[in-house]
Amino acid sequence: MKLSIFFVLFFIAIAYCQPEFLDDEEDEVEETLPVAEEGREKSCITWRNSCMHNDKGCCFPWSCVCWSQTVPRNSSRKEKKCQCRLW
């Protein structure tokens, strides 16, 4: 009899405390997620030489836009630049 009362109280305690543990885990995920997103954004917003191998879909939902530019101004040498852009 005492054992069954113990188990009933034990399961009630587990059921009562468990949502607190889940809430704590969700809070931790929410705290670390913006840091991870911010790091990803910094690594994605860089100049590229090509739109190939777009790591982890960095440009999504944007698109990777490439163009050629002359480097330095009096030279005929052209350099290809690519960047993630909304338009």
UniProtKB/Swiss-Prot annotation:
The record makes one more remark, namely:
According to the nomenclature proposed by King and colleagues (2008), 'Gsp(267)' comes from the species name 'Geolycosa sp (strain A267TDLS2-KZARNA)'. This species has been reclassified since that study, as indicated in the work of Oparin and colleagues (2016).
Question: What protein is this chain from?
Answer: Omega-lycotoxin-Am1d
Coiled coil ranges: none
> What family name appears in the similarity comment?
Belongs to the neurotoxin omega-lctx family.
- Signal peptide interval: 1-17
**Where expressed (tissues)?**
Expressed by the venom gland.
> Which stretches are tagged as propeptide in the UniProt entry?
18-40
The question of whether Signal is a record keyword is answered with yes
Q: What is its main location?
A: secreted
Q: Which UniProt keywords apply?
A: Calcium channel impairing toxin, Disulfide bond, Ion channel impairing toxin, Knottin, Neurotoxin, Secreted, Signal, Toxin, Voltage-gated calcium channel impairing toxin
Localisation: Secreted
- The organism's place on the tree of life at top rank: Eukaryota
Cysteine-cysteine disulfides: 44-59, 51-64, 58-84, 66-82
What's said on domains? The presence of a 'disulfide through disulfide knot' structurally defines this protein as a knottin.
Cellular component GO terms held in the UniProt record: extracellular region
The GO terms describing molecular function are: calcium channel regulator activity; toxin activity
Task: Please give the function described in this protein's UniProt entry.
Answer: Modulates Cav2.1/CACNA1A voltage-gated calcium channels (P/Q-type currents) in rat cerebellar Purkinje cells and hippocampal CA1-CA3 neurons. At saturating concentrations (>10 nM) decelerates activation kinetics and slightly increases peak amplitude without affecting deactivation kinetics. In vivo, does not cause death when intravenously injected into mice. In rat models, through its activity on Cav2.1/CACNA1A, has an ameliorative effect on memory defects provoked by hyperstimulation of N-methyl-D-aspartate receptors (NMDARs) in the hippocampus.
Native source organism of the sequence? Alopecosa marikovskyi
Question: What phylogenetic lineage does the species belong to?
Answer: Eukaryota, Metazoa, Ecdysozoa, Arthropoda, Chelicerata
